[in-house]
Structure formats: C-alpha cells, structure tokens
C-alpha cells in the first residue's frame, strides 16, 4: 500500500480532514473540505472556431461539504510552459472561441470555501483550416500505481524490474531496486540500492493529448480531446467522429493490496469496448498506442467479451503454445486476423 500514489492521497486527505475538523471544532468555525478533482472532462467542437469544455464534479462519499462552488479554467497556449487563468464559472461547462490554428491546452480546478482541488488532467484542441471534422483524442492513460510485488515462501518484495509502476507526475522517493527479499533476514529485509537517490523518476503527467495533437496538426488536421471517463459515461458521442486516437500509455489492470477494492486501470473496460465496437462497426478509424494494448486483455481476469473485442475489433488473438493452451501474451507473440504472427 505505502508506495501506491492513490493510497498516499487517501491517507493524506484523511489526515487533512482530521486536522480541519479538529480546528473547526476548537475555533467554532464552519467546516468545509476542499473538493476532489473533477471527472469526465471533455472538449467538444460546437461549430467552427467555437468549443465547449465540460466536466462533472466528483462527490466525496465521506464528506458532504466537499462539493465545489465554482471552477477555475486554466489555459496554456502553444509554446508556453505554464498555465494561466482565463475564467471562472459555477456551471459544469465553459464556452470559448479560438481564432487561430495553434494548439491550446486546458485544465479545470474545482474550488469551494475549503480550498482548491487537485487540477484535472490536461486536454487540448486545435482548429484546423477549413471546416473538417476534428480527430478525437481520448486519454485512456489514467494509471498511477506502486511497483509490482510478490510473495513466494520466505521471499517477498517488489518486482520493480518487471513493472516499475507509475508515479503521480514524478517521484523523488525511489532510491534503488530492492536487493534483499528474504523475510528471515531481520532488519536487512527490504534493503535496496542507493544509485537512484539523486534521480527524479518520471510519472503520469496526465498531459498527453497535446503531444499526440502536435503530430495530428502536422498532418493538417484539427483535433479535440476527452478523458476516457467522458466516453464511458456517454458524455462524448463517438458517432460524431471519423478518426479516434486512443492513448493508453502504461495503462494496465491491477489490484491494490489484498484486492478487495477491485481491479483498477484496465486498458479496455466493458463500456469502452462496447463504445469502440460500435464506432468501428460504423466505419470509424481507430488508432491505439500503449505498452499493454493487447497483453492486458489476455493477462488479467479476462472474459469472453474481452477476447471477442480483441479478435473482432483489434484483429488479434494470442498465439497457441506448442503443448496447447495460450502462450504468455507479454512475449509479443500475437496473431493478426489473417493468421500471421506479428
């Protein structure tokens, strides 16, 4: 648990709530807890040069005061490194006009009397010359996680060499790979190297549509972008697009601790599979990039619906092992729909 960014956030927020409640009661002041980051963020093109940013608040089931009162819209223009405020609204959408053909990026920050939430993921847009239907970029890389771990008899620890996990934004706490896995070695158990002490480890920045959008812009197209949550919820209709770029990055299904909280960060959820199946059946073009695009489907609690999606929509099946059964798909031995190994 301790190395998982989501767990760190949960613990940190719990401590913050406890301190805030103590001070509120001691000083007889109103208690308002800062909001959670917004969800289902999306950018849609309403008409030429006109766009709408939309999102939804994220309720805190443990704290009813944590609902936002308003939202701050932050923007970054092409060539800029930082964001600047362009507006506020109490609604869950914000309309704007774009008068150029540059790439513009946006974040939404929820706030109330308790303070500011963490910023949303970063989405981007570009208005192309003419009035072409934009490409839709879907950010499906939402994963943040600890390194892989294992327990095997007297040995246990982290398998960071197999799966390093994904820090939130960046990590400065990693000192080196674990070297002592024997649980009977007393205080030496868990010892790790120190050759990464001065290194900053890159994590999930939640800021990828602008990178993909630059390549799309170089090809002469405009684009809008959406969180995968907005697609799964139906807020974004795929039927309005001809081309989709799905970013999966290091997305990969996994569990936290004993797994009671369920499977997280699956590359293709049942609803996403359904939406993409309909989109491709209607003639849409789909480009997918990521580290575990197919292997994740066949490697972690997959069902017949997952296999059908992989075979029919993605056009791949796992290669058969010589003795029968399925090979480890992580080997890269996949068959395209025409039966050739890829």
Q: Model-found features: residue ranges?
A:
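Aromatic-Pro/Gly-enriched surface loop or interdomain linker
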Residues: 121-242, 247
